[in-house]
Amino acid sequence: MARYTGSVWKKSRRLGISLTGTGKELDKRPYAPGQHGPNQRRKLSEYGLQMQEKQKLRFMYGLNERQFRTLFDKAGKMKGIHGENFMILLESRLDNLVYRLGLARTRRQARQLVNHGHVTVDGGRVDIPSYAIKPGQVIGLREKSKNLDVVKEALEANSFVPEYTSFDADKMEGSYTRFPERSELPAEINEQLIVEFYSR
């Protein structure tokens, strides 16, 4: 299944969650798109709820189905709670951490920065968005990329970096200091529903 490239705002409204991380998609019309507007009601089955939760998380991190399932299966082989491990693996992706550090305004923008070779890990260029970052590794930008308008705008707009990261504004680089706790990850996601979906 290909990565979704349609209207992120419509998808956000349909799933009831901000996929860009800005929340702007739900400001004016916090209900699913369609002619019935806020009055439309549709009760989902158990399977429907599980599917919806999977889609919410998949679209939030911008993965296609194959990438998403591969990471889910990898999490199942780790010690600990399957769903939490899965969330941590998603959070440890390079594109996500570029976004978390404030070097990009959205994960989609962060993915483009990585794809175009602007991002470094421990001083070396890495152009693989799915690259798994380990605690202690340093994420930065190539020298010529530090003047990109999209980066400057993102840094100006960002006022928060997670406690499991650190950021040096002068060097425009940050570290993944530790794996996050579940309480530090998206509260609007019920990962157990995703585990149940793939266990059917």
Swiss-Prot record:
Signal peptide: none annotated. Keywords: Ribonucleoprotein, Ribosomal protein, RNA-binding, rRNA-binding. Residues 20-41 are annotated as: Disordered. One of the primary rRNA binding proteins, it binds directly to 16S rRNA where it nucleates assembly of the body of the 30S subunit. It comes from Oceanobacillus iheyensis (strain DSM 14371 / CIP 107618 / JCM 11309 / KCTC 3954 / HTE831). Part of the 30S ribosomal subunit. Contacts protein S5. The interaction surface between S4 and S5 is involved in control of translational fidelity. NCBIfam families: PRK05327.1, rpsD_bact. Residues 92-152 form the S4 RNA-binding domain. InterPro entries: Ribosomal_uS4, Ribosomal_uS4_bac-type, Ribosomal_uS4_CS, Ribosomal_uS4_N, S4_RNA-bd, S4_RNA-bd_sf. GO terms for cellular component: small ribosomal subunit. This is Small ribosomal subunit protein uS4. One of its GO terms (molecular function) is structural constituent of ribosome. The gene is rpsD. Belongs to the universal ribosomal protein uS4 family. SUPFAM superfamilies: Alpha-L RNA-binding motif (SSF55174). Gene3D superfamilies: Ribosomal Protein S4 Delta 41, Chain A, domain 1, RNA-binding S4 domain. The keyword Cell membrane does not apply. One of its GO terms (biological process) is ribosomal small subunit biogenesis.
